[in-house]
Regions:
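Internal intein/HINT superfamily modules and their associated LAGLIDADG
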Residues: 1-152
Length: 152
């Protein structure tokens, strides 16, 4: 399968954000009102759907579009190939992941709900990580934040 939509910095950020909190139904996220609002604003900024197509269900914000869902799943599945280099797209994708499920505690940057592929992606970009269950710790967070800001 080939991604039909053009992968932009904004779309890469949205996919990274969506990936960490995705719903099983449609294209959406599960989270608090602030996270939902962020997701909705990014979807509208990327012009994926009109505001009337966005649904709010309990703690989820989502919309339905099978073609976009397949494209987003393709990007997530092939993230290690698509985001193999330090550039604007990769920085946006990783920033989306951090903004969605990241925190900063005791000098260590943490990203929740990660997979082994996520760890591989971050390590290939030159960051040292430590993973416990689904939580990925990134050592030297100053370098990580510098990478995100430099290419944003």
């Amino acid at each position: 399968m080939v991604v039909d939509m053009k992968l932009t910095k904004e779309l890469a950020y949205l996919i990274g954000f969506w990936k960490m909190r995705s719903t099983k139904d449609g294209i959406g996220i599960t989270g608090d009102a602030e996270q939902q609002q962020k997701f909705i604003s990014e979807v509208l900024k990327a012009k994926l759907v009109t505001p009337d197509r966005v649904l709010l269900k309990g703690d989820s914000a989502l919309f339905h579009h099978i073609k976009y869902r397949n494209d987003l799943l393709y990007v997530v599945k092939n993230q290690n190939d698509l985001f193999a280099r330090k550039n604007k797209l990769t920085a946006a994708y990783v920033k989306g992941m951090y903004d969605s499920a990241g925190s900063f505690e005791k000098g260590i940057l943490l990203i929740n709900n990660t997979t082994f592929q996520d760890q591989m992606l971050i390590e290939r970009l030159g960051f040292y990580t430590e993973r416990r269950k689904k939580v990925l710790g990134i050592k030297h967070p100053d370098k990580f934040f510098e990478f995100i800001e430099r290419y944003s």
